[in-house]
Design a protein with these regions (language model features):
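HIT superfamily nucleotide-processing domains
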Residues: 8-150
Length: 150
């Protein structure tokens, strides 16, 4: 596990990033962001896009983080389309339990999808994601999920 405050590519790894399983869940590392597999899969391919550093409000991020975010989102949507062909992609920024700036990315599906050795159903479709239906990934499934997006 990373040490809190560990320096990575120009930014700091914070407690929220660690809570979502970093470094085991790391898919991509950017200057201002990390893309992680969400250890509790609400829908197949659920991800976390977390800002590096200690910002706890979206407006506290440096201007460069917003610029980079456009590139990151384009890459996220591409890897999800290639790997899982979602019908929609939802982005939720809650930050009520985990305080640092981060987004939950939920690919949405009309039907079930196979992912990381599991068959997952989007229980909230066509409404909001059903966060209570999340399936915890074990370490083997996390490795498979990360590999699916590399």
């Amino acid at each position: 596990m990373a040490r809190h405050g560990e320096e990575r590519r120009g930014g700091m790894i914070n407690a929220t990033i660690e809570k979502f399983g970093y470094p085991a869940t790391l898919v991509r590392d950017y200057r201002h962001w990390v893309l992680l597999v969400r250890p509790a899969q609400v829908t197949a391919g659920s991800l976390i896009l977390a800002a590096k550093g200690e910002a706890t409000a979206y407006g506290e991020l440096p201007a460069d983080a917003f610029t980079e975010q456009g590139t990151v989102i384009a890459e996220v949507e591409h890897i999800l389309r290639v790997a899982l062909s979602p019908d929609k992609i939802n982005y939720l920024m809650l930050m009520m339990v985990d305080p640092h700036v981060h987004f939950h990315i939920f690919p949405r599906y009309r039907g079930a999808r196979s992912f990381a050795g599991l068959v997952l159903t989007d229980h909230g479709w066509p409404g909001p994601p059903d966060l209570k239906s999340a399936v915890e990934l074990n370490s083997t499934a996390i490795v498979q999920a990360v590999a699916a997006f590399r």
